[in-house]
């Protein structure tokens, strides 16, 4: 049995640990320039926007290699704007201005990603980050599709993400005010129609069906790693009961996993979703570049305090999920109880 007063003491210790880590990280942040805090990531997003015209023009070419280059450019730029851009904007990590943060959220989430800004903030920031790996709240259960077998889910289901995303957004609009719903519908339509129009009028596609097929291909280019990353970094790790969840530092160190540096995914998805996911969950308002900068501080601190710091390779997680798909993606995960840490 735990001694009387043990839980409050552990809770106070956990808060003290988090406070100590926050102080170390804030010291690094204060010593960083604007370029390090925001500029690097803004430059990557700006380059992605500037690369779109060459990408559309490459699709005019009769050369298979140039055409493939155009598909690659548009696909990588699409994921950089929709995943990296939307993620940073939703967390308010692109700028310190509240007004501009709202503008960038609408642009990246609704125009580029075809999703609703309100639900992105609620589902991702409030629920997933607020209740990481807590069953029924922030446990990544939205990624589970028990009706699909492992091969369909891991290899075919990602191709449907570009189609499912706007459909889910429209379904969520029932829960918002009419004015907000009309705004979201307008911005989603603007984003989709803009790409369609550019494919017909700049890239020279001769039929609506070929333009739509190209849209699906470019928007599916990195769909497989996008889905995989979202399940690899939380599912299969300790899950917690809503009424017995641990303190924040234990929740994030136990329930989050970092992948190694992967150049294409680091660029398109951002460090905070790939190699610095633990850091991102502990400090969600930091930009990708700052997550990378504070990574040695966080890693050293967690190891120093003998706290978990989960890391694994993409391929190792991939094979693990194929082998244990039923356990991870179909069955209800077991609850981890941490005596004295709740």
Curated annotation (Swiss-Prot):
Motif Histidine box-1 boundaries: 87-91
GO molecular function: oxidoreductase activity, acting on paired donors, with oxidation of a pair of donors resulting in the reduction of molecular oxygen to two molecules of water
Membrane topology reported for the UniProt record: Multi-pass membrane protein
Enzyme Commission code(s) on record: 1.14.19.-
Record has Flavoprotein as a keyword: no
Keyword Ribonucleoprotein attributed: no
Keywords: Fatty acid biosynthesis, Fatty acid metabolism, Lipid biosynthesis, Lipid metabolism, Membrane, Oxidoreductase, Transmembrane, Transmembrane helix
Transmembrane stretches, start-end: 39-59, 63-83, 151-171, 185-205
Motif Histidine box-2, residue range(s) on this chain: 124-128
Location(s), subcellular: Membrane
GO term, biological process aspect, one: lipid metabolic process
Involved pathway(s): Lipid metabolism; fatty acid metabolism
Motif Histidine box-3: chain residues: 277-281
GO cellular component: membrane
Domain of life: Eukaryota
PANTHER family attached to this UniProt entry: FATTY ACID DESATURASE 2, FATTY ACID DESATURASE 6
Annotated family: Belongs to the fatty acid desaturase type 1 family.
UniProt name for this protein: Fatty acid desaturase 6
